[in-house]
Amino acid sequence: MSRFMSPRFAGLEAYTPGEQPQDQQYVKLNTNESPYPPSPAVVAAISAEEVSRLNLYPDPTGRVLKEKLAALYGVKAENIFLSNGSDDILNFAFMAFCDSERGAAFPEISYGFYPVYADLYHVDCVKIPLKEDFGVDYRDYCNIDRMVVIANPNAPTGMEISLAEIEEILKTNPNRIVLIDEAYIDFGGTSCVDLIRKYDNLLVVQTYSKSRSMAGARLGFAIADAGIIADLEKIKYSTNPYNINRLTLLAGEAAVESNAYYVENAKKIAATREMTTKRLREMGFTVLDSKANF
């Protein structure tokens, strides 16, 4: 660390990404990359003609992609927020909805970036232990008066909480954001997106990195009440309005149009998970009931 670093960050423990093999011959199971390539439509969207337009700035609003995602999820474009991977959205959420007086709560065993963001913004956080069966006890998050952050399905356990349990958390924390990180939702979980019509404090975050086979493109999106989306847009436009490049936007649009391709791939991955689980249990191992791709 140099002598120029602010004392605020002197003790910060940064997130450590997993090693990225340079020969690109492997699928990294530890980061849950998809073994399948992007859809043919996505590959076709990155044409030489579009590459030649990289001298132009991308659309900071991502209007076309927002409209396509809104149609896919049955919401309005004003309910969609786009960013450079779901990590970016998590970052903005901690920045926008937490401070020294408004804390956060999340499972003790979960995605490693949650405590990093809490430390980065000096947010008082409560790390709640899992149950003995490694599940999340939703009751621990009721009436907690903090921003609640839950990965559903959870990583690294793959276990999920029900919509009824999420709804109870929302009801009992009406003045705090409830962020549900659905990075692995397409592998067998039940999305809570429909609940945004009922609860204006729900923020659902998804990614293109897992089921949509675009980890290298860096694209994530959130679905929430228009007011929450406006808050996130304010943070985005105060930091980097052009945080999604032109080619990623085009790839994202093509991926929505070829959604059936990704649904089928997710089914194959889930089937492999179930087969592996069955074999391991037959060998005497204890395996959690995962709804993720692991």
PLM segments and residue spans:
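Phosphate-binding glycine-rich loop
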Residues: 63-103
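Glycine/small-residue-rich loop that forms an oxyanion/phosphate-binding "nest" at active or ligand-binding sites
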Residues: 85-98, 162, 180-184, 188-189, ...
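Active-site phosphate-binding strand-loop segment of PLP-dependent enzymes
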Residues: 131-186
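PLP-dependent aminotransferase-like
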Residues: 96-151
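PLP-dependent aminotransferase class I/II
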Residues: 201-281, 285-288
